[in-house]
C-alpha cells in the first residue's frame, strides 16, 4: 500500500488566472505579510498599479493606480503601506483616508509588518520601528552589523514581546549563496552576527516548566553542508529548566548541491518547523527534538515569499509561476507516518500527547495494558489521562480500576489515583463524573462535588443531576443547567419557588413546558407567586399559555383583582383576537367593582370588546357617561343624555362631538324640552363648541324656536367675535337690543366689520332706542353722515349732532357742515358749531364743502382768526390766498411774502385768473413743469429763460431742449440774448453749456460759446470754454478749427491735438504740436498719420534732436529702409532698439551695416545679446580673424549659443573656433565630423565623454567606413543598455554584421558589460554565426536575457540551443516539447530524463510516452521509472492497454506495483495470466489486494489450468464467497482447500454440507479430516447421526471423544464457580446493605433499601440510579 504522507499540500490560487502578469512574480514586486492578503505591483499599459488580492475573495482582486516603488498590506486589516523613494505613507483602504506619512533621511531597502500596528524599516545602515498609532515617528532600534554590508535583505523577524530582533540577508559568493544574520537584544542593546539563511522565533512550553521558553531557530547552508539550530535566547525564566540546544543536519539531495534555505515558519499549533529551500523542497521538523519528520520537493519553482497559514497551522507561499501553495501537518496521517515509516514510536507518542493527535492509539493501549498488568496503576493512569482523543477514558477503564484491590503498602485505591490524575489534567467526562461523585455523595461530601463543579472539572449530565438531587436540590439545578436538561431544570425551579426564572430559561433554551399545569399547581400553593408567574407567561409578544385557561384558573380561586391585573397586562397590545377576553374583563369588574371598570374604560385601553353589551351593563351600574360612550342608537342616547345633573359637563360637551349633526340637534331639543332652565347653560356650551358643524342658522332657529333670547345672546356672544357671518352679527345686535344690552350693541356696532350696515342702520332707526349712540356709530363708520344729520335734524335731536362732532368723530365736521347748509340751517349755528370743534378736522375738506356751495367767504373770520393764532397749516393759508385773489386784495404781495400756502394749489387756482400770479406762485414753490406749461401757454419765454438759467437743473434743461418741445427755438433765443448776458455766475454758464451739450445742439452751442468767449466778457480766457469751443467745432464745423487754433491761446494743446488726430485732422494736430514746440509728437504725426517720411526727414534735419532722429529711425526700420534706419540710429546715438535692428538686418542680410550699428551699440551698452550678434555678424561676413580676435578678448557674448547657430547654418569653421573657445568637446566632435576630421572628432568625443556624442561620432565613422574608429566609439556606447539597440540597428541596417559582432565580442571584457550585450551578441550569433552560439550560451547563459534569446534561437531553428536555454530558464515543459518536436537535433537521453521530472504539466508525461513508443521503445521502461513518482499510473496503464504495449512495459508495472494501484494490479495480473505464470499471479494477489477480486475470480474459474482455478477459489474465499469457493474446490477435487475454506468461513451449514458431500462419495478419510478441520463449527448430535447412518462411527470416534472431554471440563468449572459464589454470598450477609437491585421504571414504588414510612419524602426513583440494562456500574458493594 502507498505510504501515508504526514503533510497536506494544497494549491489555493494561480495568480495568472486572476489577471496578474507573470513578470510580476518576484521578491521586489510581490509581498505577502500574512495569509489574508497578497499585494502585487505591476504595470498595465504603462500605468503602475497595485493589485490587492483578498484570499477570502481571491477571484475579485482590487486594483489601484500608484506611483510607489513598494507596497505591503497589513497582516489583518485593509491598511496598506506605500513607499516612494524616501517617502512612506500608510492608507486605510476601507476608510479611503491617509493615516500616517513620513519622509526618511535614507532609502528604505526592506520593510515588513512585524505586528498588527508596527512596521519595521531597514535602511543601508540602521533598523527602525514605526508604530501606526498616534503621530510618532520611526524609532531607531539598532545599527546594521558590518557582516550585512553588501547583502540583500530578505527577512526581518522578532519574537512576540519584540525583545529579540533578527535581520536576515544573503550575498552571492563564487560557488554558493551565503547567509548573514544579525541577532539583537533590545534589553541588553547588543548584537551578534550569525551565519544563516532562514530563521524564526518560537515559544515552546516544556512539560516540567511553568513558563514558556523563547526559542531561536535558524538554518544555514555552508560550504560543508546544512544545519538546523534550535537554541533558547536570553536567560530562562525563574523556575524553568533551560532548553537543551539542538543542532541537526539538513539534508540536501545530490542534484541540489546549490540549494539553500530561503524561508522558515514555526507552527504554534503543532510545534513544528517548516523549512523551505530555494529549489522548492520542504523540510518538516519537530521543534522539541529537532527530528526531521519529512522532506520532499513541493515546487519546481522557487518559493520566494512565505507566511504562516493560520487556518491550518501550516505555511503558505508563492512561487515564481504565481502558484499560491500551502503545506500543513496532516493530523490523521502524521502519527501513523512517524510510527510506521520513521519507526520512532517515542516521537509519535510525544507528538500525539502534545498536540492531541490521533494515530497512536495502539501504542497507548499497549503501554497502558503493560503498566496495568504490571501493577503500576499510577503510571497506567497517567497514560490513560494523556492519551489523545480520550481513547482510554472509557467506562471499561474505570471498571478495570474498580475491580483491582488497593496494593499492599498503599492507602489510596487505584481508582482514586486514576481520578486524581484526571482531575489534575483537566475535566472529567460523563462516565468519570458519575463514578467519582457516587461514592463521594454516599459519604456525605457534597462540598467536594461543589468544588469540582466550580472548577469545571466535571461533565454535567442528567444522570449526574439525578444522582445529586437527592442530596442537594440547588446543586442538582446547577448541574441540570450546565447539562442542558430543560425539563429537570424547570422542575427544580418550580420546587425551589424560582418561578420568574422558568420563563426566561425556557425561552433561552427554546423549550416549551406545560405552563398551565405549572400555574395551577403554583396557584394551589402560593396564589401571590402564581399571579406573578401568570404575568410572566404573557409578558412576551406571543403568550406562552392560553390566556382563557389562565383566566379560568384565576376565577377558580375567585381572584378577581389579581385576574384584572393579569388581564390588563396581558391585553395591553389591544389585539382584535382578544375581544372576548376584553369583554370578560369588563364584565367581571362591572358586576363586582364598577369603579375599576370605569377606570379601565376611561383609559381607553381596549377597543375590541362587545360594546352594546358593556353599554347596558354600564347603565345598570349607574355609569351613564360610559353608557353614552358605547350607545349607538339615538333612542338610547336621548334617554340618557337628558340627565345632565348626573353627567360631567365637560365630558358631555365632548360627547356631542361624536354625534352626527342631526342627532346632536335632536338631543339639544330633547334637553331644552326636558328642562329649559336647567339645561340652557350646557346647551349654550355645546352650541358654542360645535356651531361650525351644527351651523349657526340651525342653532339660531333652535333658540328662537324656544323664544330664548337670553340663550341666543349668550350663544352668539361666544361666537360673534370670531364669526364672519353677517347674519350672526345682525342677530346678535337684535338679541342685545331685546335683552337691553345697549353697551354690547355699541361695542359690536363699533368693532364689527361683518354686519350689513344699511340693514343695521334701518333696524336702529326703527328700534327707537333712547340712546342714539349705536346709530351714530354705524352712520359714522359707514359714511351715512348725511343721512344721520338729516335724521337727527328732522327729529329735533340737534344735541346728538353736537355730541357727534364733539365726542364721536370731530373729523366729520366738514360733512356735517355741508349737510346743515343743504337743509338751510342758520349760518350762525354753523359758525358756532365750527368754533366749538377745535382743529380736529380737515381744513381742506371744510373749505371744499363750503367752496362747492359758493359760501367760502363764510369762513373768512374763522381763517383770519386761525392765522392770528399762529396757524401755519397750508390749507388755511391756501383758503385765504383764494379769498384775496378773488377779492383782488393785493394778491401778488401775499403770494411773494407768504411762506405757508401750497404753491401748486394756489398756482393752479390763478392760471385762468392771472398767469403772472401763477408764475409767481410756481416760481416760489419750484413747480418746474407747472411754470413751464404756464409760460409756454402764455408765451412768457423771457421769464422762462431767466428761470431755467437760475434753476440750474439738468433734467429740466433736457426736457425744454428736447425735440418734442415746439417752443425750443424761442426759448434758446431768449437764453442767448437775454438770460446769459444778464448773469455773472459761472455756475449758471456751466450748467447751461452742459445742458446744450447734453441736448446735442452743437451749432447752437457754438453760437452760445462765441457769444461768451469772442465777445469780450469775463469768461473770454476760460480754458474749459476754449477747449469746448474747439472740440465743438471739430464735431460740428471743421472749417472753423484752424481759425480757432490760431486765434485762441489758452486751451489744452496735447489733448486737443490728440482729439484732432482721432478725427483725421492731421494738419491741425501738426500745427498745434509745432505751435507749442512738441517736436517728437509733431514728427510722429508726419510719420504715423501723414505717412510722409521725406517731410519727416526734413523736419528732423531742421530740428536735429536725438529723440526726433530715433523716432525717424524706428519708422524707417519698420519700412525696411535698413541702411537709412541704421544711419538715423547712429545720428541719434541710440542703441536701444538693437533687438529690432538685428532682427530686420538679419532678414534682409545687411550684415555689413549691422556690424557698423553693433559696433556703435557695443560702445554704449555692453549687452550679451549685442556682442553675441556682433560675433555672428563677423561669421556671416567671413571676418574670422576679427571674430577670433574678439572672442579671445574680454566679452559677454553667449559663445555657445552662437556656435550652435553657426553649426546649424553650416558655418563649421566658425563653429569650430567657437566650440573650441568654450571647450564644448561634444559639439566640437560633431563639427569635426562634418569637416571630415574623424580622428580629431574621436579625440574630442573622448574629452566630452558623452554617450550621445559617442553615438554621433560612431555613426559618422560607420558611414565613412572608418570601422576602427567606429569600434573605439562603440565600446563607449554598448555599456549603456538604453543605447545598445540603436547602435545594433545602425550597423545592421547598413549590412556591417561582422564588424558589429567584432565590436560586441571586444566589449564583453569591459568592466561595465551588462546583460543586454551578451543577449544581443547571442541573437547576432543565431542569425549570422550559429556555430558560435552554443559556446557563447554555455559560457554566459546566466548573463543573457533568456526569453529574448529563446525567441531568436527558435526563429533560427537552433533546437539544441533552444532546449539548453529552456533548461536554464527552468521552462522544463517547453524544453521537453522542443526535444520531442526535434529529436534528431535536440534529444539526449540523460538530459531528457533529467528535465522530464521537473515539468509542471503532467500531460507531458503522456506525450513523452508516445514519443518513446515512436522513437525509443527499448528505453521506455527506464523513462517510465523516472516518471513514476508523479505519473497517474491508472491513465498510463489504460493507454498501454488501448495501444497493446502492456507486455513491453512489464518491468515498469513490476516496479510500481508497490503502490497497490488497481489499474497496475489488474494489468500485471492479466499479463501473468497470459504468460500462465500462476505462481507469479499468486504472489501478486497476496502482496497487492487493490483489484477487482470477483472479476478476476470469475475469469480464472474458467481457465483450463487447475492452478488458476485454484486461485479463483482462493479469491472467492478472500471475498467471503465461501460457498462458491468450496464448490470450486470440490469440482477440482481440491479437498484440502475445501476443508480449510469451510473452516475459515465459520458457517455451520457449509461445513455440514461438505461433510455430506464427502459421505455421498464414500470419502470417509476426508470425512474424518474435515471433522478435525471444522471442529468448532460442527454439532455433535449431527455428526453422531451421520456416522450412525453411514456406519462409520469409527471415523467419527476421535471427534466424539474430544467433544465429551470438553463438555466434562465445562461442567466441572461451573460447579467450581457456583461453590465460590455461594461462599461470597455468605461473607456479604454481614455487610451494611445500602441498596437492593431496583426496578427500572421511574414509576416504581418505594425503593428497596428505604423504609416505606420514609419513602414518601423522596422523589420517585430516588434510589434507583442504575446503568443501562439494569446492572449496577458502581463499586462491588453497591
Curated annotation (Swiss-Prot):
Region (WD40-like repeat 2), start-end ranges: 68-107
Record region (WD40-like repeat 1): 24-67
SUPFAM superfamilies: ARM repeat, Clathrin heavy-chain terminal domain
Region annotation WD40-like repeat 7: where it falls in the sequence: 302-330
Record region (WD40-like repeat 6): 258-301
Region (Involved in binding clathrin light chain): 1334-1643
Annotated stretches, region: Trimerization: 1552-1677
Stored InterPro entries: ARM-type_fold, CHCR, Clathrin_H-chain/VPS_repeat, Clathrin_H-chain_linker_core, Clathrin_H-chain_N, Clathrin_H-chain_propeller_rpt, Clathrin_heavy_chain, TPR-like_helical_dom_sf
Ranges for region WD40-like repeat 3: 108-149
Tagged with keyword Membrane: yes
The UniProt record lists the keyword Phosphoprotein: no
Assembly and oligomerization: Clathrin triskelions, composed of 3 heavy chains and 3 light chains, are the basic subunits of the clathrin coat. Interacts with sau.
The record's note on its domains: The C-terminal third of the heavy chains forms the hub of the triskelion. This region contains the trimerization domain and the light-chain binding domain involved in the assembly of the clathrin lattice.
Family: Belongs to the clathrin heavy chain family.
Name listed for the protein in its UniProt record: Clathrin heavy chain
Origin species: Drosophila melanogaster
Amino acid at each position: 500500500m502507498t505510504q501515508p504522507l504526514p503533510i497536506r499540500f494544497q494549491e489555493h490560487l494561480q495568480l495568472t488566472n486572476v489577471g496578474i502578469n507573470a513578470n510580476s512574480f518576484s521578491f521586489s514586486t510581490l509581498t505577502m505579510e500574512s495569509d489574508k492578503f497578497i499585494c502585487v505591483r505591476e504595470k498595465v499599459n504603462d500605468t503602475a498599479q497595485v493589485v490587492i488580492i483578498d484570499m477570502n475573495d481571491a477571484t475579485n482582486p482590487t486594483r489601484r493606480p500608484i506611483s510607489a516603488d513598494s507596497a505591503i498590506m497589513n497582516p489583518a486589516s485593509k491598511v496598506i503601506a506605500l513607499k516612494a523613494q524616501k517617502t512612506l505613507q500608510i492608507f486605510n483602504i476601507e476608510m479611503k483616508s491617509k493615516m500616517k506619512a513620513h519622509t526618511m533621511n535614507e532609502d528604505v531597502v526592506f520593510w515588513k509588518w512585524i505586528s498588527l500596528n508596527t512596521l519595521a524599516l531597514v535602511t543601508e545602515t540602521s533598523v527602525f520601528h514605526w508604530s501606526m498609532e498616534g503621530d510618532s515617528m520611526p524609532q531607531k532600534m539598532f545599527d546594521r552589523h558590518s557582516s550585512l554590508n553588501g547583502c540583500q535583505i530578505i527577512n526581518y523577524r522578532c519574537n512576540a514581546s519584540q525583545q529579540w530582533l533578527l535581520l536576515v540577508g544573503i550575498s552571492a559568493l563564487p560557488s554558493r549563496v551565503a547567509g548573514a544574520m544579525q541577532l539583537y537584544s533590545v534589553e541588553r542593546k547588543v548584537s551578534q552576527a550569525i551565519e544563516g539563511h532562514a530563521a524564526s522565533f518560537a515559544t515552546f512550553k516544556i512539560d516540567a516548566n511553568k513558563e514558556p521558553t523563547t526559542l531561536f531557530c535558524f538554518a544555514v547552508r555552508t560550504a560543508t553542508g546544512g544545519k538546523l539550530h534550535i537554541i533558547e535566547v536570553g536567560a530562562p525564566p525563574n523556575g524553568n529548566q533551560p532548553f537543551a540546544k539542538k543542532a541537526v543536519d539538513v539534508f540536501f539531495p545530490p542534484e541540489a548541491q546549490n540549494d539553500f534555505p530561503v524561508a522558515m515558519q514555526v507552527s504554534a499549533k503543532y510545534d513544528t518547523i517548516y523549512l523551505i529551500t530555494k529549489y522548492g523542497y520542504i523540510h518538516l521538523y519537530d521543534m522539541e527534538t529537532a527530528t526531521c519528520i519529512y522532506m520532499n520537493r513541493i515546487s519546481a519553482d522557487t518559493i520566494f515569499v512565505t507566511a504562516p497559514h493560520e487556518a491550518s497551522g501550516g505555511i503558505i507561499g508563492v512561487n515564481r509561476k504565481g502558484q499560491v501553495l500551502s503545506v500543513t501537518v496532516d493530523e490523521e496521517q502524521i502519527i501513523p507516518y512517524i510510527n510506521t515509516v520513521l519507526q520512532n514510536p517515542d516521537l509519535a507518542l510525544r507528538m500525539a500527547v502534545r498536540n492531541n493527535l490521533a494515530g497512536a492509539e495502539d501504542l497507548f493501549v499497549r503501554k497502558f495494558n503493560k503498566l496495568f498488568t504490571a501493577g503500576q496503576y499510577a503510571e497506567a493512569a497517567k497514560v490513560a489521562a494523556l492519551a489523545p482523543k480520550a481513547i482510554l477514558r472509557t467506562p471499561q477503564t474505570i471498571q478495570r480500576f474498580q475491580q483491582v484491590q488497593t496494593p499492599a503498602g498503599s492507602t489510596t485505591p487505584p481508582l482514586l489515583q486514576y481520578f486524581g490524575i484526571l482531575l489534575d489534567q483537566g475535566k472529567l467526562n460523563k462516565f468519570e463524573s458519575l463514578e467519582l461523585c457516587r461514592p463521594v455523595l454516599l459519604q456525605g461530601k457534597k462540598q467536594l462535588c461543589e468544588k469540582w463543579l466550580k472548577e469545571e472539572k466535571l461533565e454535567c449530565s442528567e444522570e449526574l443531576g439525578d444522582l445529586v438531587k437527592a442530596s442537594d436540590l440547588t446543586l442538582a439545578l446547577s448541574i441540570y443547567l450546565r447539562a442542558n436538561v430543560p425539563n429537570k431544570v424547570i422542575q427544580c425551579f418550580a420546587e425551589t419557588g424560582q418561578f420568574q426564572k422558568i420563563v426566561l430559561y425556557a425561552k433561552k433554551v427554546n423549550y416549551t413546558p406545560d405552563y398551565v399545569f405549572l400555574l395551577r399547581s403554583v396557584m394551589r400553593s402560593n396564589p401571590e407567586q402564581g399571579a406573578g408567574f401568570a404575568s410572566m407567561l404573557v409578558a412576551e409578544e406571543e403568550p406562552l399559555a392560553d390566556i382563557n385557561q389562565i383566566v379560568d384558573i384565576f376565577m377558580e380561586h375567585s381572584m378577581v383583582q389579581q385576574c384584572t391585573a393579569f388581564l390588563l397586562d396581558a391585553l395591553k397590545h389591544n389585539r382584535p383576537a382578544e375581544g372576548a377576553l376584553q369583554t370578560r374583563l369588563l364584565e367581571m369588574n362591572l358586576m363586582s367593582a364598577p369603579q375599576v371598570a370605569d377606570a379601565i374604560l376611561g383609559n381607553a385601553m381596549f377597543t375590541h370588546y362587545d360594546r352594546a353589551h358593556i353599554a347596558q351593563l354600564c347603565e345598570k351600574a349607574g355609569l351613564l357617561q360610559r353608557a353614552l360612550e358605547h350607545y349607538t342608537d339615538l333612542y338610547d342616547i336621548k334617554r340618557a343624555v337628558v340627565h345632565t345633573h348626573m353627567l360631567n359637563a365637560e365630558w358631555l360637551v365632548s360627547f356631542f362631538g361624536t354625534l352626527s349633526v342631526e342627532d346632536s340637534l335632536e338631543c339639544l331639543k330633547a334637553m331644552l324640552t326636558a328642562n329649559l332652565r336647567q339645561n340652557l347653560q350646557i346647551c349654550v356650551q355645546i352650541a358654542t363648541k360645535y356651531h361650525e358643524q351644527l351651523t349657526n342658522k340651525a342653532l339660531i332657529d333652535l333658540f328662537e324656536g324656544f323664544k330664548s333670547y337670553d340663550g341666543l345672546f349668550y350663544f352668539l356672544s361666544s361666537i360673534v367675535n370670531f364669526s364672519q357671518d353677517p347674519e350672526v352679527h345682525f342677530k346678535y345686535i337684535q338679541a342685545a337690543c331685546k335683552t337691553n344690552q345697549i353697551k354690547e350693541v355699541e361695542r359690536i356696532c363699533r368693532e364689527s366689520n361683518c354686519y350689513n350696515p344699511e340693514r343695521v342702520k334701518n333696524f336702529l332707526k326703527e328700534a327707537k332706542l333712547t340712546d342714539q349712540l349705536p346709530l351714530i356709530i354705524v352712520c359714522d363708520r359707514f359714511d351715512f353722515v348725511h343721512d344721520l344729520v338729516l335724521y337727527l335734524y328732522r327729529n329735533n335731536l340737534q344735541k346728538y349732532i353736537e355730541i357727534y362732532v364733539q365726542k364721536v368723530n370731530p373729523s366729520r365736521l366738514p360733512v356735517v357742515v355741508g349737510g346743515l347748509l343743504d337743509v338751510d340751517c342758520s349760518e350762525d349755528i354753523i359758525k358756532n358749531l365750527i368754533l366749538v370743534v377745535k382743529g380736529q378736522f380737515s381744513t381742506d375738506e371744510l373749505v371744499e364743502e363750503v367752496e362747492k356751495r359758493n359760501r367760502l367767504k363764510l369762513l373768512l373770520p374763522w381763517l383770519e382768526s386761525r392765522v392770528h393764532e399762529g396757524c401755519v397749516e397750508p390749507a388755511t393759508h391756501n383758503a385765504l390766498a383764494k379769498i384775496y385773489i378773488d377779492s383782488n386784495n393785493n394778491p401778488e404781495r401775499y403770494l411773494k411774502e407768504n411762506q405757508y400756502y401750497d404753491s401748486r394749489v394756489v398756482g393752479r387756482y390763478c392760471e385762468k385768473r392771472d398767469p403772472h400770479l401763477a408764475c409767481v406762485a410756481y416760481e416760489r414753490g419750484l413747480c418746474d413743469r407747472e411754470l413751464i406749461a404756464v409760460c409756454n401757454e402764455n408765451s412768457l419765454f423771457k421769464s422762462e429763460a431767466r428761470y431755467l438759467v437760475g434753476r440750474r437743473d439738468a433734467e429740466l434743461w433736457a426736457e425744454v431742449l428736447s425735440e418734442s418741445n415746439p417752443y425750443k427755438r424761442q426759448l434758446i433765443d431768449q437764453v442767448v440774448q437775454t438770460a446769459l448776458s444778464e448773469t455773472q455766475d459761472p455756475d449758471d454758464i456751466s450748467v447751461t453749456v452742459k445742458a446744450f451739450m447734453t441736448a446735442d445742439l452743437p451749432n447752437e452751442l457754438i453760437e452760445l460759446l462765441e457769444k461768451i468767449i469772442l465777445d469780450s466778457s469775463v469768461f473770454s480766457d476760460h480754458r474749459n470754454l476754449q477747449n469746448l469751443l474747439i472740440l465743438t467745432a471739430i464735431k460740428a464745423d471743421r472749417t472753423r478749427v484752424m481759425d480757432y487754433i490760431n486765434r485762441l491761446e489758452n486751451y489744452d494743446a496735447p489733448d486737443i491735438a490728440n482729439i484732432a488726430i482721432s478725427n483725421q485732422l492731421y494738419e491741425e494736430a501738426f500745427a498745434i504740436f509745432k505751435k507749442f514746440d512738441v517736436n517728437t509728437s509733431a514728427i510722429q504725426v508726419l510719420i504715423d498719420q501723414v505717412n510722409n517720411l521725406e517731410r519727416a526727414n526734413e523736419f528732423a534735419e531742421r530740428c536735429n534732436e536725438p529723440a526726433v532722429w530715433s523716432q525717424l529711425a524706428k519708422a524707417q526700420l519698420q519700412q525696411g529702409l535698413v541702411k537709412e534706419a541704421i544711419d538715423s540710429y547712429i545720428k541719434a546715438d541710440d542703441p536701444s532698439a538693437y533687438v529690432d535692428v538685428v532682427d530686420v538686418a538679419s532678414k534682409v542680410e545687411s550684415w555689413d551695416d549691422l556690424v557698423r550699428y553693433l559696433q556703435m551699440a557695443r560702445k554704449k551698452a555692453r549687452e550679451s545679446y549685442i556682442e553675441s550678434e556682433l560675433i555672428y555678424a563677423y561669421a556671416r561676413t567671413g571676418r574670422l580673424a576679427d571674430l577670433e580676435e574678439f572672442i579671445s578678448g574680454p566679452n559677454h557674448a553667449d559663445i555657445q549659443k552662437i556656435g550652435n547657430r553657426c553649426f546649424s547654418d553650416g558655418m563649421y569653421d566658425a563653429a569650430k573656433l567657437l566650440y573650441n573657445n568654450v571647450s564644448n568637446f561634444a559639439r566640437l566632435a560633431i563639427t569635426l565630423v562634418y569637416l571630415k576630421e574623424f580622428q580629431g572628432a574621436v579625440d574630442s568625443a573622448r574629452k566630452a565623454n558623452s554617450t550621445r556624442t559617442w553615438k554621433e561620432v560612431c555613426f559618422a565613422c560607420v558611414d565613412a567606413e572608418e570601422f576602427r574608429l567606429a569600434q573605439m566609439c562603440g565600446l563607449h556606447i554598448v555599456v549603456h543598455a538604453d543605447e545598445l539597440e540603436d547602435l545594433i540597428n545602425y550597423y545592421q541596417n547598413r549590412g556591417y554584421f561582422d564588424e558589429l559582432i567584432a565590436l560586441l565580442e571586444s566589449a564583453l571584457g569591459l568592466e561595465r558589460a551588462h546583460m543586454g550585450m551578451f543577449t544581443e551578441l547571442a541573437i547576432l550569433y543565431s542569425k549570422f554565426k550559429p556555430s558560435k552560439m552554443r559556446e557563447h550560451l554555455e559560457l554566459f547563459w546566466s548573463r543573457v536575457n533568456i526569453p529574448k534569446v529563446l525567441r531568436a534561437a527558435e526563429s533560427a531553428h537552433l533546437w539544441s540551443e533552444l532546449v539548453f536555454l529552456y533548461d536554464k530558464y527552468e521552462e522544463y515543459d517547453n524544453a521537453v516539447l522542443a526535444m520531442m518536436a526535434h529529436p534528431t537535433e535536440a534529444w539526449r537521453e540523460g538530459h531528457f530524463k533529467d528535465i522530464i521530472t521537473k515539468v509542471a504539466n503532467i500531460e507531458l508525461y503522456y506525450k513523452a510516452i508516445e514519443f518513446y513508443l515512436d522513437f525509443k521503445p527499448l528505453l521506455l521502461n527506464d523513462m517510465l521509472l523516472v516518471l513514476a513518482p508523479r505519473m497517474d499510473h491508472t491513465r498510463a496503464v489504460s493507454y498501454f492497454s488501448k495501444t497493446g504495449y502492456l507486455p513491453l512495459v512489464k518491468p515498469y508495472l513490476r516496479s510500481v506495483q508497490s503502490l497497490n494501484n488497481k489499474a497496475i494490479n489488474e494489468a500485471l495480473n492479466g499479463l501473468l495470466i497470459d504468460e500462465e505464470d500462476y505462481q507469479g499471479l499468486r504472489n501478486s494477489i497476496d502482496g497487492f489486494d487493490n483489484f477487482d477480486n470477483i472479476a478476476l475470480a470469475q475469469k480464472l474459474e474458467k481457465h483450463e489450468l487447475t492452478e488458476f482455478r485454484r486461485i479463483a477459489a482462493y479469491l472467492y474465499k478472500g471475498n467471503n464467497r465461501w460457498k462458491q469457493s468450496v464448490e470450486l474446490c470440490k469440482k477440482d477435487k481440491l479437498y484440502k482447500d475445501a476443508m480449510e475454506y469451510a473452516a475459515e468461513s465459520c458457517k455451520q451449514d457449509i461445513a455440514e454440507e461438505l461433510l455430506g458431500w464427502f459421505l455421498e462419495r464414500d470419502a470417509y478419510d476426508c470425512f474424518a479430516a474435515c471433522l478435525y478441520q471444522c471442529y468448532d463449527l460442527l454439532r455433535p448430535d449431527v455428526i453422531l447421526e451421520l456416522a450412525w447412518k453411514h456406519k462409520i462411527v469409527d471415523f467419527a470416534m476421535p471427534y466424539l471423544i474430544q467433544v465429551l472431554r470438553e463438555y466434562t471440563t465445562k461442567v466441572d468449572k461451573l460447579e467450581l464457580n457456583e461453590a465460590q459464589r455461594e461462599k461470597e454470598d455468605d461473607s456479604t450477609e454481614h455487610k451494611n446493605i445500602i441498596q437492593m437491585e431496583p426496578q427500572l421504571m421511574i414509576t416504581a414504588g418505594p425503593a428497596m433499601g428505604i423504609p416505606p414510612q420514609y419513602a414518601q419524602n423522596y422523589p420517585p426513583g430516588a434510589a434507583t440510579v442504575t446503568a443501562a440494562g439494569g446492572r449496577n456500574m458502581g463499586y462491588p458493594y453497591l
